[in-house]
């Protein structure tokens, strides 16, 4: 397979075992700042996906709440394949801490009573949300917290 420019296109999606959180890449800026991009994979690629209303609400909830747990978050974005998210941190390379930040953020999702910015002024598709869908996705991921480090399902 020819090496592609996009890191995830070089990942053999048939070999990974969701759920997991993996370091997808790093980038160093001219002044020495380092961005660490993580793949938060909720669903098994090409086998299952998150339904859009739940995914959309999960995106809003995670993007808003993750910043309460770390001031190093640059961005949190959904994958177009609807199997996960990317989260980027600046100058923060502690993998175990990233797992704890994601865990705390997903617990915030479970405790949410509304979806932030779920209106036509602040959201581009405000009609497509499901708080309950987001909570279901979050709970399923949290239920497998002990597997998040095991990208290839090897038990290591």
Curated annotation (Swiss-Prot):
Cofactor binding remark: Binds 1 Fe cation per subunit.
Keyword entries, A-Z: Autoinducer synthesis, Iron, Lyase, Metal-binding, Quorum sensing
SUPFAM superfamilies attached to this UniProt entry: LuxS/MPP-like metallohydrolase
This protein's record includes keyword Isomerase: no
GO biological process assignments: L-methionine salvage from S-adenosylmethionine; quorum sensing
Names of required cofactors: Fe cation
EC number, UniProt record: 4.4.1.21
Gene3D superfamilies per record: S-ribosylhomocysteinase (LuxS) (3.30.1360.80)
Any one GO molecular function term: iron ion binding
Function: Involved in the synthesis of autoinducer 2 (AI-2) which is secreted by bacteria and is used to communicate both the cell density and the metabolic potential of the environment. The regulation of gene expression in response to changes in cell density is called quorum sensing. Catalyzes the transformation of S-ribosylhomocysteine (RHC) to homocysteine (HC) and 4,5-dihydroxy-2,3-pentadione (DPD).
PANTHER family recorded: S-RIBOSYLHOMOCYSTEINE LYASE
Family, similarity comment: Belongs to the LuxS family.
Summary of subunit composition and partner proteins: Homodimer.
Name this polypeptide is given: S-ribosylhomocysteine lyase
């Amino acid at each position: 397979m020819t090496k592609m420019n996009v890191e995830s296109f070089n990942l053999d999606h048939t070999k990974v075992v969701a759920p997991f959180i993996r370091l997808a890449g790093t980038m160093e800026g001219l002044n020495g700042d380092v961005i660490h991009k993580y793949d938060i994979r909720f669903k098994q690629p090409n086998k299952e996906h998150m339904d859009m209303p739940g995914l959309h609400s999960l995106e809003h909830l995670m993007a808003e709440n993750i910043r309460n747990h770390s001031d190093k978050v640059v961005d949190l974005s959904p994958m177009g394949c609807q199997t996960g998210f990317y989260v980027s941190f600046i100058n923060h390379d502690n993998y175990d801490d990233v797992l704890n930040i994601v865990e705390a953020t997903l617990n915030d999702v479970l405790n949410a009573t509304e979806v932030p910015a779920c209106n036509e002024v602040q959201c581009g598709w405000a009609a497509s949300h499901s708080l309950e869908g987001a909570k279901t996705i979050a709970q399923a991921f949290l239920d497998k917290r002990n597997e998040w480090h095991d990208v290839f399902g090897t038990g290591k």
